[in-house]
């Protein structure tokens, strides 16, 4: 039922009840009975203000909409605003990355353009709020031509853990980086000093930029909230001006995709088949995940190099080199574009010229050595021919195996038919040492 509209008479009744001490103990019906003769004796000029007040109240009630809430009691309108702001910020970030790559491409400096990759490890996350307690930080400068030119790595000792979350921090550390918890943690204890050092290192190659331009760093989408929160955590204790240059965290996956498209364009190679899903799938494979010698000494010793931030940022640089340097004919330098020591994930066994390539499965064709691929290229790799070659090469090892050819319907084993025929005894090839028990 729609709510009743206010009228001038009821507005007058409410005012009479508020201003008349006699009316304080009366009910609404009794107050209406008292005010009815007074209202009838009033003229239009006296009733005018009350009618106007009632009209204004009705207009305000219609315009004022009740705020919708979700199941957790949060405002739906505020959630929509936050969602739209996040979408707008992501779109602006992607446009900024594309402008950076386009500017470097137009100035013929694409291979010399430097990017900064950063990563944080953390002890724990606050239950309420986007707050991460930092544990380790690493960064590196990378370009296609020079590879990894320099890197920065440090462990962090914040001095304490969020109250009541020691158990969560212990579980997270045990399953990931295995760094000792504060106050026994390693590294710098002065958060303000550490932030100034990190900021100065990130800004050292940006002299040509204006002071108000932000410092742009790149990390994975999963680590973006961690990196942003850890930078805020360190900056909260640093003595910096509000107008100081800020650190902006961008998506390295979009950089990987945009840079690959531009590299192929510069190399004169068609890039129609390159899309975000292709480049993202290549990046997340993380081919250098278990490479030795690229993490810090602590994680190398305890065999946790996969979770070391120093290893992360270097692996990202190696992935960029592995995917793009060949398109621009850039030679790979060990330690800069690829690890110093690379262990192959396959073993090539020398074979004679009489190697039976028909016994190689179709799945192993693309992982076979180039010599084998070349010789296999002239062969028929259709499923039918492959099946025939495998059947010819197969030699049964079990002497009790059924040796029928199964070429005719009579020899095919019956599956519950009425006329069940047993195969001839000659089809069973029993070994000399085997006898049938009677």
UniProtKB/Swiss-Prot annotation:
Keyword Cytoplasm belongs to the record: yes
Renumbered residue ranges of the record's region Disordered: 374-438
Keyword Transcription regulation tagged: yes
A GO CC term attached to the entry: cytoplasm
DNA-binding region: 2-69
SUPFAM superfamilies assigned: HMG-box (SSF47095)
Segments of skewed composition (Polar residues): 381-391
Molecular function in Gene Ontology: transcription cis-regulatory region binding
Gene3D superfamilies: High mobility group box domain
Function (record text): Involved both in the piRNA and miRNA metabolic processes. As a component of the meiotic nuage, plays a central role during oogenesis by repressing transposable elements and preventing their mobilization, which is essential for the germline integrity. Repression of transposable elements is mediated via the piRNA metabolic process, which mediates the repression of transposable elements during meiosis by forming complexes composed of piRNAs and Piwi proteins and governs the repression of transposons.
The family this protein is said to belong to: Belongs to the maelstrom family.
Protein name per UniProt: Protein maelstrom 2
Native source organism of the sequence: Drosophila persimilis
Encoding gene (name): mael2
């Amino acid at each position: 039922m729609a709510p009743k509209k206010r009228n001038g008479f009821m507005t007058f009744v409410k005012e009479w009840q508020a201003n008349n001490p006699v009316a304080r103990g009366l009910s609404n019906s009794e107050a209406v009975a008292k005010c009815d003769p007074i209202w009838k004796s009033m003229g239009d000029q006296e009733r005018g203000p009350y009618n106007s007040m009632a009209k204004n109240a009705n207009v305000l009630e219609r315009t004022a909409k009740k705020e919708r809430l979700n199941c957790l009691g949060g405002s739906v309108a505020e959630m929509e605003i936050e969602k739209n702001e996040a979408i707008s910020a992501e779109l602006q970030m992607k446009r900024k990355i594309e402008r950076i790559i386009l500017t470097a491409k137009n100035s013929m400096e694409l291979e010399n353009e430097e990017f900064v990759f950063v990563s944080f490890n953390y002890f724990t996350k606050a239950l309420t709020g986007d707050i991460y307690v930092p544990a380790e930080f690493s960064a590196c400068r990378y370009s296609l031509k020079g590879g990894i030119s320099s890197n920065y790595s440090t462990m962090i000792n914040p001095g304490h853990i969020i109250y009541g979350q020691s158990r969560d921090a212990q579980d997270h550390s045990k399953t990931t980086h295995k760094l000792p918890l504060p106050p026994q943690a390693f590294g710098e204890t002065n958060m303000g000093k550490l932030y100034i050092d990190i900021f100065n290192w990130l800004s050292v190659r940006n002299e040509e930029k204006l002071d108000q331009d932000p410092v742009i760093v790149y990390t994975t989408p999963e680590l973006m909230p961690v990196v942003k929160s850890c930078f805020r955590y360190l900056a909260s204790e640093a003595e910096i001006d509000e107008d100081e240059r800020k650190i902006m965290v961008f998506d390295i996956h979009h950089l990987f995709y945009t840079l690959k498209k531009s590299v192929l364009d510069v190399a004169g190679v068609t890039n129609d088949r390159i899309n975000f899903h292709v480049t993202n799938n290549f990046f997340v494979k993380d081919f250098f995940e278990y490479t030795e010698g690229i993490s810090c000494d602590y994680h190398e010793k305890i065999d946790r190099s996969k979770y070391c931030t120093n290893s992360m940022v270097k692996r990202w640089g190696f992935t960029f080199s592995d995917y793009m340097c060949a398109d621009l004919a850039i030679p790979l330098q060990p330690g800069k574009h690829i690890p110093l020591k690379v262990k192959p994930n396959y073993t090539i066994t020398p074979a004679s010229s009489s190697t039976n390539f028909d016994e190689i499965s179709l799945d192993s064709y693309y992982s076979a050595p180039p010599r084998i691929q070349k010789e296999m290229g002239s062969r028929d790799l259709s499923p039918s021919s492959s099946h025939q070659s495998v059947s010819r090469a197969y030699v049964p090892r079990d002497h009790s195996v059924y040796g029928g050819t199964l070429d005719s319907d009579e020899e095919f084993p019956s599956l519950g038919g009425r006329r069940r025929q047993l195969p001839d005894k000659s089809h069973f090839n029993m070994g000399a040492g085997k006898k049938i028990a009677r």
